[in-house]
Amino acid sequence: MKQWKLFCLCALVSAPIYAQFTYPSCNPLQQSEFQATELFNKTGANSAQATNSGLNEPVQFDVQGVYNTNGDSVLYTNIYFVERKGKVKYYDGLAKRVDSIGFIPNWGYQSSNNSNDNGLMGIVLDPNFNTNKWIYFWYTPTIPGAAATGASSNANRRLRLSRITLTAQNRLDMASEKILIDVLGSKTDQYHCGGPMTFDRNGDLWVTIGNNSNDLNGSGSQYAGQTSTSPTATDSNNSGEWGSANTASIRGGVIRIHPDNAATTVRTDRSGTYGPGYTVPAGNFGDYWAGQFDQSNPTLAAQYRDPSKVLPEVYIKGTRSNYSVAVHPTKGWLAWGDVQYNATNDEYNLVTHPAFTGMPYFMANNTPTPAGSIVLPTGHSAATPINASLMNSGVRNLPPATPALIWYGTTTTQTTMNNNVAISGPIYSYNRNLKSSVKFPPHLNNSWVLMTVYGSPSSGQMYIAMLDSINPVLQGTPQQQGTAGVVRFNVRNPLQAKYGPEGALYILNYGSTGAYGSGNNPGISRINYTGSCQLAAVPIAKNTRAANLNVSMFVDGLVVHEGGSHEFSMIDLNGHQIFTVKGIGETRYSFPKLSAQFGFKKGVYLARVQSNQGVFTRKVSLL
């Protein structure tokens, strides 16, 4: 495992625990510079909290910013969140009140069995929500005519991605529901249905979907019994090869689509219906791996381009129970947490391109999972995984398994993170042009929030890991819980965290009791930074040139004519610093090469050169 710097966010303490977070010209962070406020909880009894909350299993949320008339500053934030049993609720940040705004019928409510992952599992607001009022939901719809137990209707279980519009009265208009994806679920299993979603800066929607399988049978194998039995004679419940390792299945991975109301394409297969209402961005799993295999195995490359063999929506395969997702705001790196083999081995993943992450064959650092009585095909390894199951309708030869970035459980000696559910929080990108007095400071630029749920302590934990500024790896060495450098906030089994439009951190606490219950005091909190280290905005409306700093522009780059040292940065129009590199002497910078290295896309940016001779800035368009 790569070395990594880890800081715990648990109960509030008074020690100077932020000391290891530093930034040039600013003091090290202090605990007193952060203010944690519980916006509302289950009872809402505190007058400072929202009234009428009455929470019951809140699982996911999103934050809406209400802006000033100039549109450049957040006045306050509203929160939309869902409860697993189907209620959609709204926290009014101005009135400080929680109200129910709708109910989505779902199998988690219809079924009398509460111990499952079915229900209303995900919510995300459209990037243009303030004008179009669109909300996306991931849920397991009700089964028409099914009894409360649902035992006679297992074959009709489904997984669904929908878009619903709010009315002018801020209520769900169920008649407006637009179903984007509707597929069959497991016939007998109710677990690992996924649901967390996020949008990236390109307007692409990322959706996590677990393997929708309990994937353990009597032998303890993740995939036993499914390579020798006809899929028509048995259910796929006990097979990870049916979902996680099946490239033609939506289950066991992460999908990426681009919602487009004008898109009319509809595709159906044996599992369900895809579309209309979205397009598929280039560069997903099939596109990427076809390109990788073009030279070495053209026949296999052709299979990866076949939409009947590789689902076009798929970006990641090989997950088990991934109930979190985050995308780096500027670099586009994809992060998620996954509950791995036997629910005792968890991992955090961070990738820069489509990948197969191992399940059901491998976990953690590509440690094999138990195969039970199954004899794996000749040639099967982490470098050349093979899905030979009769349950497999996708490609047989999978890409090399990508190991996790962080893992813990029976396969590691990492004891500071030993809980039962790995949840990826957001990755922070400091925006110096954002007008906000509470946004997190530049010390935490490129930091990644990690969370654990249940286990010991039963309330879960939160950490901040610092990422390398260029590559998706972690910095530093482990910090043990309780030592200097540990950051602490109060959490009660945190299921989700995300940064709001004002740069504050929001945390959803499921509650301190176990899963599938009303929970002991669930709620949502906000953490504001109240310190003094905020950087001045970067001017992006005009070009500047220092009298003694000689920089020459050319078609696709620039040359710094400088005898000493300098820094070259690329900044987007929101003030996010895409990257910074240091140079000495005369240096030529090629925009296409830098784009390939740092992963920024076409658009308008500010190129910035700084040395002891001054500062040079120029708006550039990358086509």
Range-by-range predicted roles:
Residues 531-557, 623:
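Residue-level detector of functionally pivotal "anchor" positions at catalytic/ligand-binding pockets or at interdomain
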Residues 332, 503, 570-578, 605:
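Short, glycine-anchored, charge-dense loop/turn motifs used at functional sites
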Residues 152-198:
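Asp-box/WD-like beta-propeller blade repeats and closely related beta-sheet repeat scaffolds
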Residues 41-86, 420-424:
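Beta-strand-rich domains and repeat architectures in extracellular enzymes and scaffolds
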Residues 94-125:
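Blade-loop segments of beta-propeller domains
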Residues 76-103:
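Beta-propeller domains
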Residues 542, 594-623:
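C-terminal tail/sorting-segment detector
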Residues 21-30, 74-75, 82, 109-113, ...:
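Beta-propeller domain segments
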